């Protein structure tokens, strides 16, 4: 395998107009990899540290310090390393940083290099990224969890739930699933317009109408599914990202005008899954409510996927604790929450070995980088959420999955309804 010859980073803009890190790695055989690092709006307190410059430039959100850390310390530390030694390279960067949460060099600096190394190594090996990482058996295309109504921290719609997603579980292939999702998305626009509501978009390409409640938003989506000619629950299921830490204050959940306990929120979710074909609920409780998650999983975990995002932050140590406590039953996978590819691999492997499902995920601040599409297939996640079928930084990932499905040809398998516990057994 070729050796790393040169490592370089620059400051670019993400989809929200904020700076982020782009890293490039060049190998001595001429191979090259480039990676753009995403950034979240609603971030868990346990996430790896995203290094920002502060000051007046870019309203304090510049990343020149992270860029300099790549161009100086990290570049020197990994120069000459064999590019296929991903784990050794990631470990070297973690050791160089020397902090528990990558706060000295910045997870955004380390992750950019980690991904760029893998891309360069894949090019050197003459393999697509999903095949280089996942090996010859990587063949499952994920269910696209399309965020078509944006709320919470992703929009100014007034609704507390952050994401309302559709999951085309009845499709026979990824390409058919993408078509179904796009048709419902356009149908939803006409439904929203017919009710005199705004068709403005949130950060992730979903509509952000001002609706009075979670149920009102779900009713719009169900109407759109039916208008597009599909059957809710059979063809297309629903999913929520509640991001409840965003409205948890002073020991209570400030949800839809009331103050609720974890037990009361559990009853809200039980009612929702009884009334709507919901297959997945993400971050239903505050990120450190271990007891609440255990109780909620015992109550409804056999009926619905309970996904830990801020709860697990793609961290193997937190996931291990969740497994021991039987808290949640699925892991949201965000590479920038943990900061290296190999730590991400470890988290996904731990989840799968313990019967937890996994959903690969973008962030609300994205770039045109399509790495997560390849990772979803490589790691056998079975689900991916990367926004609405709109805005090029979202669609880029879906289009990459179309390419992968075409490359796999008859070997491609679409995860479909088998990805969710509601349809098991």
From Swiss-Prot:
Stated name of the protein: Enolase
Pathway this chain belongs to: Carbohydrate degradation; glycolysis; pyruvate from D-glyceraldehyde 3-phosphate: step 4/5
Annotated compartments: Cytoplasm; Secreted; Cell surface
Catalytic reactions of this protein: (2R)-2-phosphoglycerate = phosphoenolpyruvate + H2O
MF terms (GO), sorted A to Z: magnesium ion binding; phosphopyruvate hydratase activity
Binding site for Mg(2+): 241, 282, 309
One Pfam family this sequence matches: Enolase_C
Transmembrane segments: none
Entry-linked InterPro entries: Enolase, Enolase-like_C_sf, Enolase-like_N, Enolase_C, Enolase_CS, Enolase_N
Swiss-Prot/TrEMBL cofactor(s): Mg(2+)
Active-site residues per Swiss-Prot or TrEMBL entry: 204 (proton donor), 334 (proton acceptor)
Described purpose of this protein according to its UniProt entry: Catalyzes the reversible conversion of 2-phosphoglycerate (2-PG) into phosphoenolpyruvate (PEP). It is essential for the degradation of carbohydrates via glycolysis.
